Amino acid sequence: MPVQQRCTVVEMTPINPTTYWMVLEVGNMVEELGLRAGQFLHVACGEANLLRRPISVALAYPDEPEDTAALIFEVKGEGTRWLARRQVGDTVDVLGPLGNGFAVENGGRYLLVGGGIGTPPLLGYAEAFRQNAVAVLGFRSADRVILEERYREACKEVYLCTDDGSAGRHGFVDAQVRDILEKDKNFTAILACGPRPMLKSVAAGAAEFGVPCQ
């Protein structure tokens, strides 16, 4: 059952000119409500706190004195611009946890496929499964790449793709996914998060090779 509460900002760091890493103290959402990576929180944005924005959870930890959750968001309008101006010690109105996240099993081996701002929700799974995780990360261009170092520290292998070829492989992630599955399809599942066209292409490739996809 989602709860509404005021959460304190304990970290706010720009990742690039339009993307921010924000860590909140979230009460007992992790330990008692099961908040985890891949879910999201509805954060009220604006002085009147009238507009809520769904922000994906990249990491969630039981902690003291309160559980913590790392959220990553892009500045796209007035609401997220307001959110980016929050400072450590400020509080924001949060509703959550919401969404289902991914169904995973201990000891599983996973192919993580993230596109753009769909990359953060998979970070918790990369850090949980580490050498049992392979990641394919796709972005529009080199200046939009986020979290690459975190994924490289965690995963056995990381493949980077950009639409314009300015970093990593030139093209979309689905081509890289197919190349991986042609050589090795021994994955428990593919976990994918990103734009709808990307998800459809990745799901089609997964079906072709008989690998479950979420």
Sequence positions of predicted segments:
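Ferredoxin-reductase
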Residues: 2-88
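FNR/FR-type flavoprotein reductase catalytic core
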Residues: 78-214
